[in-house]
Curated annotation (Swiss-Prot):
CDD domains: UdpNAET. The active site is at C115. Cell wall formation. Adds enolpyruvyl to UDP-N-acetylglucosamine. Target for the antibiotic fosfomycin. Phosphoenolpyruvate binds at K22, N23. Belongs to the EPSP synthase family. MurA subfamily. Its EC number is 2.5.1.7. It is found in: Cytoplasm. Pfam families: EPSP_synthase (PF00275). Its main location: cytoplasm. This is UDP-N-acetylglucosamine 1-carboxyvinyltransferase. InterPro entries: Enolpyruvate_Tfrase_dom (IPR001986), Enolpyruvate_Tfrase_sf (IPR036968), MurA_subfamily (IPR050068), RNA3'P_cycl/enolpyr_Trfase_a/b (IPR013792), UDP_GlcNAc_COvinyl_MurA (IPR005750). The keyword Iron does not apply. One of its GO terms (molecular function) is UDP-N-acetylglucosamine 1-carboxyvinyltransferase activity.
Length: 419
């Protein structure tokens, strides 16, 4: 397995170009199964999960090409089963189910894998598809969906806010007969982006970005060209990298209005922040950040995917900060690793109390999930001495060329190839 070796401490400064959002590109790639004509998707990041998705789409009979953009032609889909060997590494595969049953009347997906951070049941996806008239069976480790004729529009009230299930229901409902209303829908920018992609293909969707999305079913979706929005979590990660190292950064190809909660907390921590239409700059003027209190919650509140990075910020800040995680259980696996580097923290159920220290020391640490592993790499950039981060395949699932981008900001980081 590959590792990162990071030599610190360094002040990170310079410019970074933000990649397309993984969490929008994935649902958009799966939603392309609904289109009867070719689709061009621009600004798709080069990531392990994207490669897996492209393989999965190919296995379903879709023509997939990548040359700058990703080109998808789903006009000849002839296999309606997403097998375990591809699904096991990536839970996003469940997003194949809605489009398959909506367009072809049948689909089956092996129960998914992915990061091990708490319960992420597929129940809400199943609940939504059943409301639209699909018959669902769980057999031999597969979720199997079928319908005679077309799905039927429905008024669906979600028990809890779920990004994944909102995507499934919204994409399936585009080809359903009649109108579907999703109440308590997720409001994330990536949901809006997926909806806008579907609209570009001819879907009739309104209310995306609010908690009530309305979809008027159409008979078919055509082709089109669409550009994936910038990755707000990658943007936030690099802003934190500059903030914890006293540095100065400009993030290009960013979308500031998707990061309001994060920018507010960075300002509270003492950062000078300016924004333009597609850029964000942060300047710490060489100062240590001040500790902040953070509570994760569904968008537009503070994102759970930025929690690990802000835990690190608090651990090297002036003062004591409290971080409360309300979205996933079991999402403080980075904290014991940071304690090995000299951090002072206590975990109490879903809260971590961070007592800022002036410096961290390099150590051998292990990545446990995608965002936690990014925080360990950033910790290595500011710690004294050498840090080795093991199991970085987690990082490769969500960050495009993170070591190249950090190196351009002055980090001393190298990838050590595993056996």
């Amino acid at each position: 397995m590959d590792k990162f070796r990071v030599q610190g401490p360094t002040r990170l400064q310079g410019e970074v170009t933000i990649s397309g959002a993984k969490n929008a590109a994935l649902p958009i790639l799966f939603a392309a199964l609904l289109a009867e004509e070719p689709v061009e998707i621009q600004n798709v990041p080069k990531l392990k999960d994207i490669d897996t998705t492209m393989k999965l789409l190919t296995q379903l009979g879709t023509k997939v090409e990548r040359n700058g953009s990703v080109w998808i032609d789903a006009s000849n889909v002839n296999n309606f089963s997403a097998p375990y060997d591809l699904v096991k590494t990536m839970r996003a595969s469940i997003w194949a189910l809605g489009p398959l049953v909506a367009r072809f009347g049948q689909g089956q997906v092996s129960l998914p894998g992915g990061c091990a951070i708490g319960a992420r049941p597929v129940d809400l996806h199943i609940f939504g598809l059943e409301k639209l008239g699909a018959e669902i069976k769980l057999e031999e480790g597969y979720v199997k969906a079928s319908v005679n004729g077309r799905l039927k529009g429905a008024h669906i009230v979600m028990d809890k806010v779920s990004v994944g299930a909102t995507v499934t229901i919204m994409s399936a409902a585009t080809l359903a007969e009649g109108t579907t209303i999703i109440e308590n829908a997720a409001r994330e920018p990536e949901i809006v982006d997926t909806a806008n992609f579907l609209v570009a293909l001819g879907a009739k969707i309104s209310g995306q970005g609010t908690d009530r999305i309305t979809i008027e079913g159409v008979e078919r979706l055509g082709g089109g060209v669409y550009r994936v929005l910038p990755d707000r979590i990658e943007t936030g990660t690099f802003l934190v990298a500059a903030a914890i190292s006293g540095g100065k950064i400009v993030c290009r190809n960013a979308q500031p209005d998707t990061l309001d909660a994060v920018l507010a907390k960075l300002r509270e921590a003492g950062a000078d922040i300016e924004t333009g239409e597609d850029w964000i700059s942060l300047d710490m003027h060489g100062k240590r950040p001040k500790a902040v209190t953070v509570r994760t919650a569904p968008h537009p509140a503070f994102p759970t995917d930025m929690q690990a990075q802000f835990t690190l910020l608090n651990l090297v800040a002036e003062g004591t900060g409290v971080i409360t995680e309300t979205i996933f259980e079991n999402r403080f696996m980075h904290v014991p690793e940071l304690i090995r580097m000299g951090a002072h923290a206590e975990i109490e159920s879903n809260t971590v109390i961070c007592h800022g220290v002036e410096k961290l020391s390099g150590a051998q640490v292990m990545a446990t999930d995608l965002r936690a592993s990014a925080s360990l790499v950033l910790a290595g950039c500011i710690a004294e001495g050498t840090t080795v981060v093991d199991r970085i395949y987690h990082i490769d699932r969500g960050y495009e060329r993170i070591e190249d981008k950090l190196r351009a900001l002055g980090a001393n980081i190298e990838r050590v190839k595993g056996e």
